[in-house]
Amino acid sequence: MSPSDVPINWKRNLTVAWLGCFLTGAAFSLVMPFLPLYVEQLGVTGHSALNMWSGLVFSITFLFSAIASPFWGGLADRKGRKIMLLRSALGMAIVMLLMGLAQNIWQFLLLRALLGLLGGFVPNANALIATQVPRNKSGWALGTLSTGGVSGALLGPLAGGLLADQYGLRPVFFITASVLLVCFLLTLFFTRERFQPVSKKEMLHVREVVGSLKNPKLVLSLFVTTLIIQVATGSIAPILTLYVRELAGNVSNIAFISGMIASVPGVAALLSAPRLGKLGDRIGPEKILITALIISVLLLIPMSFVQTPWQLGVLRFLLGAADGALLPAVQTLLVYNASNQIAGRIFSYNQSFRDIGNVTGPLMGAAISASYGFRAVFCVTAGVVLFNAIYSWNSLRRRRETLAAK
């Protein structure tokens, strides 16, 4: 039997992709705890200037990722997903190394933008697994894969803070580059893909991509859902520590309590995502998506009325369990509605919407809290998610009616 006849071991690829998403998630979040401190070390002084530059270096990565994702997705559909994973991991490793050598804030800002341009490991990992896994296991596989990035993002800040305290700020960037290099090597030696390159002339143009979708309006609604999920998550991030301090009063361990409450949704998502993904394979990802959105609304509203940090922590844990089902359900529905030929671009478009949400959410949360107080953020966010639940339900209902008419 020739190598081309040997079946792809998608379970091994899933394991390697999970490790890759874990390492990239950890690498991205390793530097987050001390980002403002590094900005200050690069010569930025004054409260206002420090806030402005910290916000810029944080958000510029997502902005440039949103711009670049469709290009990399198209290239993945032409050249293959594995090569895009390798490009992303190696490119980010080099940029992280250079960040540790930055001498001024402008160099650092440019490198943060370059990090966004060269990213894309997670959407390409999703596209690779989505095109290899059996359709009846898509929900479980994509749910499991999502826990890789979540796990890395949970452990990254803790490890980054400890490493920065032990070795200083710059060495953490070098350690992060090493982590990404390990990700590159794992992908290079253990990921298998059988891909027939497509010439540029044979590639579908954007209109043809839209025309090839089984339900373009539904796919657009899924992109919007991804954006709103990130807006809802990000809107709470800027005010969480301050809200916890307001609830807790004068306590000595406010940082620890805030850290715990910030991390519990991720822990809950780790536990729920594979299980709810598997349930979605049985009963349909549509039901999982709508149910999780409605539960999210019902949990966000009481968050504005809690009286203690622990009440907030319990509600955020339950919210994390519901949120763990959302992105895998969206990705599974994207798999159902797009062919393998355009999977790279569809997942990259979805990533662009996710990045826009990552930028928009914190801005929305900060603006609402400045005008109306912390508690209003939860009510407005609940309203946004409720709108999305109704919009998604309507899009899915129309899809069912279209299928019934056929």
UniProtKB/Swiss-Prot annotation:
Its main location: membrane. The chain crosses the membrane at residues 16-36, 56-76, 90-110, 113-133, 144-164, 171-191, 222-242, 254-274, 288-308, 317-337, 376-396. Keywords: Cell inner membrane, Cell membrane, Membrane, Transmembrane, Transmembrane helix, Transport. Coiled coil: none annotated. Gene3D superfamilies: MFS general substrate transporter like domains. One of its GO terms (molecular function) is transmembrane transporter activity. InterPro entries: MFS (IPR011701), MFS_dom (IPR020846), MFS_MdtG_subfamily (IPR050497), MFS_trans_sf (IPR036259), Mutidrug-R_MdtG (IPR023692), Tet-R_TetA/multi-R_MdtG-like (IPR001958). One of its GO terms (cellular component) is plasma membrane. It holds the Pfam family MFS_1. It is found in: Cell inner membrane. CDD domains: MFS_MdtG_MDR_like (cd17391). It is a multi-pass membrane protein. Belongs to the major facilitator superfamily. DHA1 family. MdtG (TC 2.A.1.2.20) subfamily. This is Multidrug resistance protein MdtG. It comes from Citrobacter koseri (strain ATCC BAA-895 / CDC 4225-83 / SGSC4696). The lineage of its organism: Bacteria, Pseudomonadati, Pseudomonadota, Gammaproteobacteria, Enterobacterales.
